[in-house]
A protein has these predicted regions:
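A cross-family phosphate/adenosyl-ligand binding-site feature
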Residues: 2-109, 113-115
Length: 115
């Protein structure tokens, strides 16, 4: 059986730990990928010793439909990111991956952080 792939993204700096907690809660048999926006990256780098990949790397393998992700979770999802996804704007890795999920009819879960 093919290993399932899940993409988790964080687009809100104040809730980057929520995205990481989701990664921790996913079963070990799932292949996990994590994306974060620049603000999320700044907060995480200050709070941990992790090196994070750039949200501007729109050519990353997970930005392609051929990558075959089964689902994507954006938690937290800023209103800016939600609006870009709703309007079809794919100008960074998070929004590009979300666009691919919609195009491929895959699960896309958005967890807004403000209303």
């Amino acid at each position: 059986m093919k290993k399932r792939k899940i993409v988790v993204a964080s687009s809100g700096a104040s809730g980057v730990n929520l995205g990481l907690k989701i990664i921790d809660l996913l079963p070990d048999e799932i292949e996990k990928h994590f994306i974060m926006t620049q603000n999320s990256q700044i907060v995480l780098e200050k709070e941990s010793n992790l090196s994070i990949h750039s949200n501007e790397d729109i050519s990353a393998s997970i930005a392609s439909g051929s990558f075959g992700a089964d689902a994507m979770i954006i938690a937290p999802c800023s209103m800016n990111t939600l609006a870009k996804i709703a309007c079809g704007i794919a100008d960074n890795l998070v929004t590009r991956c979300a666009s691919v999920m919609i195009k491929e009819h895959k699960k896309l879960i958005l967890a807004p952080r403000e209303m």
